[in-house]
Structures are given as C-alpha cells and as structure tokens.
C-alpha cells in the first residue's frame, strides 16, 4: 500500500544543536513535492525533549500526522509514533544515531564533549574549536544554530546525549512505515544505526547519502527519506 502524504501534516524535529531552519531547507522541497504540510518546530534548548513531544502532541490534535526528524529528533519522533500508532501515518528518520540506550554511541560522546567544552570554555572558544574540526558547511550551520541556542545549549546537548531511543525490540512493534536516510561516511551518525532501525521495523526502507551531498544541498537528506518511503509502496 502506497504511503500518501498529500495534505498530511508532517512534524520534523531538529538534531542536537541544530534547528528548524536546517529542517526547513532539508525537507520543505521534498515534502512539497508530495503535497505534505511541513511543521518544523524550533528547538527549546531549556527543555529539548519535552518541547519536541509537546509539538508532536499539538500537531496531532487535528488528526493523524507523519513524524520524524534528524538524529535525536528522529529518535523522539519514533518513540512518539510507538506510543501513538493510531495517530501516525509514517516516520521519516534522517541520520539516526543509536537504538536503545546511548552508551558510547559517537553522537552521544560528541554531544557530551561539546557540552563540557561549552561549560568550561564558553561559546566563542568552543565554536572556534568546532569549526576547525568540521566540514565548512557543517561549521557554518552549527555556528549559526549554536549561537541562537546559547546559553542553554549545553543543557540541550546533555539531555540529548542521555536520551534512551527506541530499542530494536521496540522498533519491531512500530505500526507506521519507517523511511530512513543514512550517510555512508558520517562517523557521528553511523550507517549501521540506520541499518539496525530498518532491520528491526516491520515495514521499513533505507536510502543513503554522503556528507558532501547534503553539504552541497540539504534537500538531498529529505529527498532520501521520501525516496525510501516511496519504496515501501
């Protein structure tokens, strides 16, 4: 059965330290192409997870929705979908970072490290360090979004790094179709995490991208999710 998002409110949540501006650029074009209505709530770094859940609840008041996001946003959306099977049309998961407890997942380690440096050294020095070790496009993205979320940014990073995502056993109970986009060369969001999500869920597909592709055009990430969803038809 084809998953039809035409006219469907689609709530997409940002990754840790990222924001709704990036979600807009990554997903608005691909979603518009299939007639979906994008809702991209801004992160609330002082209450990151609760803010995401509140946005999902509010959007679902008027009927079933599609949900998803990037990294931690994808994990929160998947957890919400598991808890609300009757209100979830589909799950669009871009760059999932881990399943279950974060443990030593690279994204969790990176968020903890960044939070510790922000607390110790401040925003300017930590941003300079980040820029030196990141691709230029990502450095520019995070410089903008980190500044907007300061001074609560370390709180958001620590909350995300401690988040227990749906486990593979839990994803096996996902009623909604799951479309995953994973990068083949992202050390922070390993391809294996996306493969694990897709292997666990009953109805799921994955498409891959490269960091260079999404750096050149953020919409490549959203397009990969929508292509994966179309494969489920």
Features from the language model and the residues they span:
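Short beta-strand/loop motif that positions the catalytic acidic residue
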Residues: 174, 180-182
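Gly/Ala-rich beta-loop-alpha elbow adjacent to hydrolase catalytic centers
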Residues: 69-77
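Helix-rich cap/lid subdomain of alpha/beta-hydrolase
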Residues: 95-144
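Catalytic active-site module of serine/aspartate enzymes centered on a nucleophile-bearing elbow/loop
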Residues: 203-233
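Hydrophobic, aromatic-rich cap/lid helix
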Residues: 140-168
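Conserved alpha/beta-hydrolase "acid-adjacent" motif
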Residues: 187-193
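Conserved HGGG/HGGXW glycine-rich cap/lid loop of the alpha/beta-hydrolase fold
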Residues: 1-46
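Conserved acidic catalytic loop of the alpha/beta-hydrolase fold
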Residues: 47-65
């Amino acid at each position: 059965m084809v998953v039809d998002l035409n006219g469907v409110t689609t709530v997409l949540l940002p990754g840790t330290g990222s924001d709704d501006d990036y979600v807009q650029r990554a997903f608005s074009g691909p979603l518009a192409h299939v007639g979906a209505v994008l809702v991209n709530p801004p992160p609330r770094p002082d209450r990151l997870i609760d803010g995401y859940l509140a946005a999902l609840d509010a959007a679902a008041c008027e009927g079933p929705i599609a949900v998803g996001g990037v990294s931690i946003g994808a994990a929160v959306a998947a957890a919400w979908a598991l808890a609300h099977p009757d209100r979830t049309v589909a799950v669009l998961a871009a760059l999932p970072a881990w399943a279950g407890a974060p443990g030593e997942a690279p994204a969790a380690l990176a968020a903890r490290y960044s939070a510790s440096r922000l607390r110790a050294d401040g925003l300017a020095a930590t941003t300079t360090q980040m820029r030196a070790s990141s691709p230029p496009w990502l450095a520019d993205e995070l410089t903008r979004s980190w500044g907007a979320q300061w001074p609560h940014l370390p709180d958001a990073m620590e909350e995300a790094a401690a988040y227990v995502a749906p486990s593979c056993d839990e994803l096996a109970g996902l009623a909604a179709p799951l479309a995953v986009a994973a990068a083949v060369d992202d050390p922070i969001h390993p391809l294996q995490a996306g493969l694990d999500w897709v292997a666990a869920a009953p109805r799921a597909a994955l498409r891959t991208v490269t960091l260079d592709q999404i750096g050149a055009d953020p919409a490549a990430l959203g397009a990969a999710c929508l292509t994966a969803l179309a494969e489920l038809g």
